[in-house]
Amino acid sequence: MNNRPIRLLTSGRAGLGAGALITAVVLLIALGAVWTLVAFADGCPDAEVTFARGTGEPPGIGRVGQAFVDSLRQQTGMEIGVYPVNYAASRLQLHGGDGANDAISHIKSMASSCPNTKLVLGGYSQGATVIDIVAGVPLGSISFGSPLPAAYADNVAAVAVFGNPSNRAGGSLSSLSPLFGSKAIDLCNPTDPICHVGPGNEFSGHIDDYIPTYTTQAASFVVQRLRAGSVPHLPGSVPQLPGSVLQMPGTAAPAPESLHGR
C-alpha cells in the first residue's frame, strides 16, 4: 500500500483532493447557513435583553442598561436585541407592577415568536424591583404583582440586576427567586445606600459606581449562562466533516470588573 501523504491540491492539477476540499468548503458554508437560519429566522436575535431602567431615567434602558448591553455584545459577538420595559419610573415608585406586567407580556411574546432566542432580564434601581416581581421575589413580606408563569422560566437564560432595593429587606434575587435563583446575579455596590445597609454609604455609590465594573461583571456572568444553554436542535441529520467541531460564531473575551448605576 502506498503510505505517502495525500496532497489535496497540486500546482499542476486538481484531483480528488481538490474535489474533497471544495466539498468540505461548500459543506461548511451550508452548515453555517443552517445555523444562521436557526439563529435569525423571522428576525429573531441570538439573545435579547429585557431591561428596566432606574428612577427618573428617560424611556429606554438607561445608562446602566446600555453599558451592560454594550459589554455583553463585546464579550459575545452575538446578535443581541434589546427591549426596554415600558413603565413609569417615577420617584413615587408606584408602577413596578405595571413594569413587571409589561416585561412578562414581552417574554411570553418572544417565547412564541422567537423560541430559540435566549432571553436575558435586567434592571437597575427601581428597575431591579420590577425584575424582582417578574422573578417572584417579594419586597420584604409584600408582593407587588404576579411573577412570570413557571412554564416560561426555561426561556430565560440569565438575570442581572444592579442596586436592587430588595437587598435592604434581607435578601437578593439570586437567593430568593424560585424561578431564576441559579441563573441570576444581583450586584450591589457596598457604598450604595439603595441596596446596602451599613456605614460608608454615599448616594454617589448608587449613581456613579456601577459602570463599568459591575456592568462588565454582570455581562461576564450572563455570557457563561448563554454559552451553557442548549444548542438549537436541527431537524434531520446534518453531515459533518470527520474530526471537525461545529462552533457558533462569537468568542467570549475575558471579563473585567467595574462600577456605575442608577
Swiss-Prot record:
It is an enzyme of class 3 (hydrolase). Residues 1-41 form the signal peptide. The keyword tRNA processing does not apply. The active site is at 125 (nucleophile), 192, 206 (proton donor/acceptor). One of its GO terms (molecular function) is carboxylic ester hydrolase activity. InterPro entries: AB_hydrolase_fold (IPR029058), Cutinase/axe (IPR000675), CUTINASE_1 (IPR043580). Belongs to the cutinase family. The keyword Acetylation does not apply. Its main location: secreted. Residues 241-262 are annotated as: Disordered. Gene3D superfamilies: alpha/beta hydrolase. Keywords: Disulfide bond, Hydrolase, Secreted, Serine esterase, Signal. Its EC number is 3.1.1.-. This is Probable carboxylesterase Culp3. Disulfide bonds join 44-114, 188-195. The lineage of its organism: Bacteria, Bacillati, Actinomycetota, Actinomycetes, Mycobacteriales. The gene is cut3. GO terms for cellular component: extracellular region. It is found in: Secreted. The record marks 126 as: Transition state stabilizer.
